[in-house]
Amino acid sequence: MTTDPDRLGAKAEAGGATGPPLTVTLLGTGTSTGVPVLGCACAVCTSADPRDARLRTSAHVVAHTDAGDVHIQIDAGPDFRQQALRHDVTAVDALVVTHEHFDHVTGLDDLRPLFFRNRAPIPVVALPRTAEALHGMFRYIFDRTYPGASLLDLHPVGDAPVRVASRSVEGAAVEVIPLRAPHGAFEVLGLRIGAFAYLTDVGEVPDAVRAALAGVEVLVLDGLRPEPHPTHLTFAEAAEVAAAVGARETWLVHVTHAVPHVEADATLPDGVKLAYDGLVLEVGGTEA
């Protein structure tokens, strides 16, 4: 594992975060099985509403800096190739991996065509445990043992902000603030960029993370279903977090096939909505 301080610097200032305008595309909003679920004929799995069709949860963030755009991919699960083609993802300057569960990482090798565009290594940002797991899962990539593989560099992160730089535009960079929250017995990685934050696959949101989310305008947050789950937030728990941090709008992701979009969305409080695949969020450059 290597760290390139020019590409990914961990010396950024802590405290208030000023971010550029962002375009956030939710590539997938479904739980680990995706929706429709294989073999299921429930009302949601057979729904004609495209918002009920949910690929595995991931997102693509484009930061529009003065120097140029920076493209950050959040997770690359088994649907990543399909998602990237559907939503015209043509560049990835860094991959942020929330955790090592299969629905978030098994599309990692589909970054190859984007690497080959300029052959600059793609940083893979993850918590240390996740980075270790990724190395074990994809040794042929990270050990450089296969000549046709892309060059992906693991970057274990802690609590310090990091700067992600464009792989193609000189001087274009954005600060990313890591967020750590429990997903059952281990932690997952969330992030904040300026007025935007993303936190999926969490069973609770600790006080330290809530403090780091203060002033966020747009929050993408785990919300599996109305009923309790040991490692995911319920709709009510997610709404409580959104209210506590003062988010202007909160979009729930990682949603199961037990949730019909129209009916469930109507039950949520003001400012909290069910996300859906292909949703595009424009977040203005603000100081938080």
Tell me the role of every PLM-derived stretch.
Residues T2-L199, D265-E287:
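Binuclear metal-dependent hydrolase catalytic cores
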Residues E204-T286:
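Cap/insert and terminal regions of metallo-dependent hydrolase folds
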